[in-house]
């Protein structure tokens, strides 16, 4: 549960007309400095987007840079005629989800799902224990949802961990994240590990036929519900995007003899954009977060825009000003020294505080952190949140606009998901404004984000359906089309 979920807000009627309070000189000077560091002017948006476009092109060659542009091997999108029952498996950090999706065509579907807790010991145990547990959950689910069914059921596996994907059904784990630390999986293809476990538990009527990321599922599910969607994006705890590309535009795949006008969904994996620190305007707070992270020097773009980091940026700003004697008047700040003390929901709550004197923010700091705040301090904190949130949205827009420019389309529907996009106040409006600032009013206003369908559930089932229809490339098919 987030801090925002756990916090009980006052029930009295809000009254916010805008505060006329003036900050003292010290706080105002600090605010001016923050505004200079965090404001992303239009000229900088253009430079970041230009750099992004060049990295997209580079990633499609045999010598990619910071944005690897990973082929998903999905060569088609839903055409509305998909029908049938498909399974989906979503392996998260704390839960395992199994879904049965009845695909009904024309954007319609019916979903039944169950969640299973992942015991902590499985996340640090053996690979057999993990995959046997997953297979057993699938078996129990199938017995409940499809009792007595003997014919094979295809299952799509949403495996949102860094992978090298060699075909739709062959993905090797590069490195565990999300608290997993299991020997014998990194460097291995996860498909055979799951298939072997299904056999061990006697689940013989389930066939794994597709492995995908949640971002890929987001695009496919959104395209099914809203035909014409050609980009899928996640702005949540992390960030990523995928899009539909022409085979002729992917030089690193020209060793295969596929038609040049064939489409392929490309998974950008753009969290590492600008690891060389050429254009992104990092502050000292961004640098500190990077240096103290488990992967210093990597994920530069993600660390500036993703929900996993926004709360920590605010926390570091407040501690910095406390150390300089500008905030909290010598109070005990032990609670905000905890690196996990602030998540993005704290910024959201402060930005939507409806009271003129920011009463809810005052109560939040007193009850959660044991800190009394003056109205001046609360106004400063609120403005800091706005700066952090706005920077996130504007830099997020650069990646989307780079894809729009790369695809050279006059308009674009973007299936979008993630907690920041769905829950952060004014993020969508700030994103839309940045589209116009980057692409111009005419084109920018035609880049439309829509709430995505369930990518890791419905999307995985649909990818499984696409594979069954020959719209995704297996290892055998790729071997047949490899040029001599």
UniProtKB/Swiss-Prot annotation:
GO terms for molecular function: ATP binding; D-glucose binding; fructokinase activity; glucokinase activity; hexokinase activity; mannokinase activity. This is Hexokinase-1. GO terms for biological process: canonical glycolysis; fructose metabolic process; glucose 6-phosphate metabolic process; glucose metabolic process; glycolytic process; intracellular glucose homeostasis; mannose metabolic process; pentose-phosphate shunt, oxidative branch. ATP binds at residues 90-95, 237, 307-308, 344-348, 419-423. It comes from Schizosaccharomyces pombe (strain 972 / ATCC 24843). Substrate binds at residues 160-161, 177-178, 213-214, 240, 269, 302. PANTHER family: HEXOKINASE, HEXOKINASE TYPE 1-RELATED. Residues 213-454 are annotated as: Hexokinase large subdomain. It is an enzyme of class 2 (transferase). It comes from the Eukaryota. Belongs to the hexokinase family. Transmembrane segments: none annotated. Monomer. Catalyzes the phosphorylation of hexose (six-carbon sugars) to hexose 6-phosphate. Phosphorylates D-fructose, D-mannose and, to a lower extent, D-glucose. Compared to hxk2, has low affinity for D-glucose.
